[in-house]
Regions:
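Prokaryotic Sec-type signal peptides and long signal-anchor helices
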Residues: 6, 21-22, 114
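Bacterial N-terminal signal peptides
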Residues: 12-24
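Bacterial N-terminal signal peptides that target proteins for export
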Residues: 2-15
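Generic low-complexity, intrinsically disordered sequence content enriched
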Residues: 7, 19, 83-84
Length: 136
Protein backbone atom coordinates (compact mmCIF):
# COMPACT_ATOMS: atom_id res chain seq x y z
CA UNK A 1 0.00 0.00 0.00
CA UNK A 2 2.86 2.41 0.79
CA UNK A 3 4.24 1.92 -2.71
CA UNK A 4 0.84 2.71 -4.22
CA UNK A 5 0.53 5.98 -2.25
CA UNK A 6 4.11 6.90 -3.15
CA UNK A 7 3.39 6.20 -6.82
CA UNK A 8 0.20 8.32 -6.70
CA UNK A 9 2.11 11.23 -5.14
CA UNK A 10 4.82 10.94 -7.79
CA UNK A 11 2.26 10.87 -10.62
CA UNK A 12 0.41 13.87 -9.17
CA UNK A 13 3.67 15.85 -8.83
CA UNK A 14 4.63 15.00 -12.41
CA UNK A 15 1.23 16.11 -13.72
CA UNK A 16 1.43 19.39 -11.81
CA UNK A 17 4.95 20.04 -13.11
CA UNK A 18 4.03 19.43 -16.76
CA UNK A 19 0.79 21.41 -16.44
CA UNK A 20 2.73 24.39 -15.06
CA UNK A 21 5.34 24.04 -17.81
CA UNK A 22 2.62 23.98 -20.48
CA UNK A 23 0.95 27.11 -19.09
CA UNK A 24 4.29 28.93 -18.86
CA UNK A 25 5.11 28.01 -22.45
CA UNK A 26 1.77 29.18 -23.88
CA UNK A 27 1.25 32.43 -21.96
CA UNK A 28 3.69 34.57 -24.01
CA UNK A 29 2.03 33.52 -27.29
CA UNK A 30 -1.40 34.36 -25.91
CA UNK A 31 -0.16 37.73 -24.66
CA UNK A 32 1.21 38.62 -28.09
CA UNK A 33 -2.10 37.78 -29.75
CA UNK A 34 -4.08 39.74 -27.17
CA UNK A 35 -2.14 42.92 -28.04
CA UNK A 36 -4.38 43.32 -31.09
CA UNK A 37 -7.54 45.40 -30.90
CA UNK A 38 -10.38 43.25 -32.27
CA UNK A 39 -13.10 44.61 -34.54
CA UNK A 40 -15.94 42.21 -35.33
CA UNK A 41 -17.70 42.06 -38.68
CA UNK A 42 -21.33 41.12 -38.06
CA UNK A 43 -24.33 39.72 -39.90
CA UNK A 44 -25.93 43.15 -39.42
CA UNK A 45 -23.27 44.46 -41.84
CA UNK A 46 -21.48 46.46 -39.20
CA UNK A 47 -17.98 46.82 -37.80
CA UNK A 48 -18.16 46.53 -34.00
CA UNK A 49 -16.82 48.76 -32.65
CA UNK A 50 -17.16 51.13 -35.56
CA UNK A 51 -14.20 53.26 -34.45
CA UNK A 52 -11.10 52.34 -32.45
CA UNK A 53 -8.09 54.27 -31.16
CA UNK A 54 -4.63 52.72 -30.95
CA UNK A 55 -0.98 53.73 -30.81
CA UNK A 56 1.66 53.44 -33.54
CA UNK A 57 2.90 49.86 -33.74
CA UNK A 58 -0.34 48.29 -32.54
CA UNK A 59 -2.37 45.85 -34.60
CA UNK A 60 -6.07 45.73 -35.38
CA UNK A 61 -7.63 42.33 -36.06
CA UNK A 62 -10.88 42.20 -38.00
CA UNK A 63 -12.81 39.02 -37.20
CA UNK A 64 -15.63 37.83 -39.45
CA UNK A 65 -18.25 36.66 -36.94
CA UNK A 66 -20.91 36.51 -39.64
CA UNK A 67 -21.83 32.89 -40.36
CA UNK A 68 -23.53 33.67 -43.69
CA UNK A 69 -21.40 36.25 -45.55
CA UNK A 70 -17.85 37.11 -46.43
CA UNK A 71 -16.62 40.59 -45.57
CA UNK A 72 -13.67 42.75 -46.57
CA UNK A 73 -11.63 45.59 -45.09
CA UNK A 74 -10.08 48.17 -47.40
CA UNK A 75 -8.59 51.64 -47.25
CA UNK A 76 -7.84 51.52 -50.98
CA UNK A 77 -9.90 54.06 -52.96
CA UNK A 78 -9.47 51.93 -56.09
CA UNK A 79 -11.31 49.06 -54.38
CA UNK A 80 -13.94 50.92 -52.35
CA UNK A 81 -17.34 51.42 -54.00
CA UNK A 82 -17.12 55.13 -53.15
CA UNK A 83 -13.53 56.41 -52.93
CA UNK A 84 -14.65 59.18 -50.55
CA UNK A 85 -15.59 56.53 -47.94
CA UNK A 86 -11.93 55.61 -47.34
CA UNK A 87 -8.81 57.57 -46.46
CA UNK A 88 -5.34 57.14 -45.01
CA UNK A 89 -2.87 59.62 -43.54
CA UNK A 90 -0.02 60.98 -45.64
CA UNK A 91 2.87 58.53 -45.73
CA UNK A 92 0.70 55.45 -45.15
CA UNK A 93 0.04 52.73 -47.72
CA UNK A 94 -3.52 51.54 -48.43
CA UNK A 95 -4.37 48.00 -47.38
CA UNK A 96 -6.99 45.48 -48.42
CA UNK A 97 -7.92 42.19 -46.80
CA UNK A 98 -9.61 40.66 -49.85
CA UNK A 99 -12.72 38.65 -48.96
CA UNK A 100 -12.59 37.23 -45.42
CA UNK A 101 -14.56 33.97 -45.01
CA UNK A 102 -16.78 33.35 -42.01
CA UNK A 103 -14.76 32.58 -38.89
CA UNK A 104 -11.52 33.98 -40.34
CA UNK A 105 -9.56 37.13 -39.50
CA UNK A 106 -7.40 39.81 -41.07
CA UNK A 107 -4.70 41.70 -39.16
CA UNK A 108 -2.96 44.97 -39.95
CA UNK A 109 -0.21 46.68 -37.97
CA UNK A 110 -0.34 50.48 -38.08
CA UNK A 111 3.00 52.27 -38.40
CA UNK A 112 1.91 55.78 -39.45
CA UNK A 113 -0.14 57.99 -37.09
CA UNK A 114 -3.40 59.54 -38.24
CA UNK A 115 -6.97 58.67 -39.18
CA UNK A 116 -7.70 55.62 -41.32
CA UNK A 117 -11.24 55.35 -42.72
CA UNK A 118 -12.09 51.94 -44.14
CA UNK A 119 -15.00 50.15 -45.79
CA UNK A 120 -16.32 46.69 -46.57
CA UNK A 121 -16.83 47.04 -50.36
CA UNK A 122 -19.52 44.32 -50.67
CA UNK A 123 -21.61 46.07 -47.97
CA UNK A 124 -20.37 49.63 -48.26
CA UNK A 125 -23.69 50.88 -49.65
CA UNK A 126 -25.33 49.43 -46.51
CA UNK A 127 -23.10 51.70 -44.40
CA UNK A 128 -20.46 49.14 -43.40
CA UNK A 129 -17.75 51.69 -42.65
CA UNK A 130 -15.24 52.10 -39.83
CA UNK A 131 -12.26 54.04 -38.62
CA UNK A 132 -8.96 53.66 -36.79
CA UNK A 133 -7.26 56.60 -35.12
CA UNK A 134 -3.55 55.97 -34.62
CA UNK A 135 -1.73 58.14 -32.07
CA UNK A 136 2.04 58.57 -31.75
Amino acid sequence: MFLTIKRAVCIRATLIFFSAAYVAATVPAASQESDAVVVKMTAERMFVPEKVSIKVGQTVEWANDDTTMTHEVTTDPNIASDPSDVSIPEGAQPFDSHLIPSGKTFRHQFTVPGLYRYACPPHENDGMLGGVTVAK
